[in-house]
């Protein structure tokens, strides 16, 4: 079941579902986010692809594209361990991970696993950045 907060960014891709949140929730999609989406679509032909730019919740300049969360549902994951699934995603995004992307949280499921639990993970608040803003002396 798709949560209501994601439906405004719903995009159809040839019978697949792509949930897009835009750059840090702004609705705009930046070049890194667009490249990530394109590469994952090409490499994994996902049935569901959710990509969130979570950079806005971190100590980075506004408009940054450094922290992402991705949920990928693909039949390519059948018979693969979670580590093997993550390696497929990392291989597809090698250029981004070597450059602008600092953090990538991954949910990689088969269609059957998604059918059993379509709950999307959420990220905890950022604890990095300027410690003075976190109440530490």
From Swiss-Prot:
Gene: BOLA1
Places the protein is found: Mitochondrion
Domain of life: Eukaryota
Modified residues annotated as Phosphoserine in this record: 81
Record keywords: Mitochondrion, Phosphoprotein
Quaternary structure, from the entry: Interacts with GLRX5.
Keyword Methyltransferase attached: no
Main localization of the protein described in the UniProt heading: mitochondrion
Protein name: BolA-like protein 1
Keyword Membrane attached: no
Region (Disordered): 114-137
InterPro entries listed in its UniProt record: BolA, BolA-like_sf, BolA/IbaG_stress_morph_reg
PANTHER family according to UniProt: BOLA TRANSCRIPTION REGULATOR, BOLA-LIKE PROTEIN 1
GO CC terms, sorted: iron-sulfur cluster assembly complex; mitochondrion
Family: Belongs to the BolA/IbaG family.
Pfam family, one: BolA
General function of this protein: Acts as a mitochondrial iron-sulfur (Fe-S) cluster assembly factor that facilitates (Fe-S) cluster insertion into a subset of mitochondrial proteins. Probably acts together with the monothiol glutaredoxin GLRX5. May protect cells against oxidative stress.
């Amino acid at each position: 079941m798709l949560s209501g907060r994601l439906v405004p960014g719903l995009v159809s891709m040839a019978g697949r579902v792509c949930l897009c949140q835009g750059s840090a929730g702004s609705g705009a999609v930046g070049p890194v986010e667009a490249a990530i989406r394109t590469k994952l679509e090409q490499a994994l032909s996902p049935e569901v692809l959710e990509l969130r730019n979570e950079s806005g919740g971190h100590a980075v300049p506004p408009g940054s594209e450094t922290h992402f969360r991705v949920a990928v549902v693909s039949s390519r994951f059948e018979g693969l361990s979670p580590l093997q699934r993550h390696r497929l995603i990392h291989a597809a995004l090698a250029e981004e991970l070597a450059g602008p992307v600092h953090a990538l949280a991954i949910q990689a499921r088969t269609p059957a696993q998604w059918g059993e639990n379509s709950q999307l993970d959420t990220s905890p608040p950022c604890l990095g950045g300027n410690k003075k803003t976190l109440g530490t002396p």
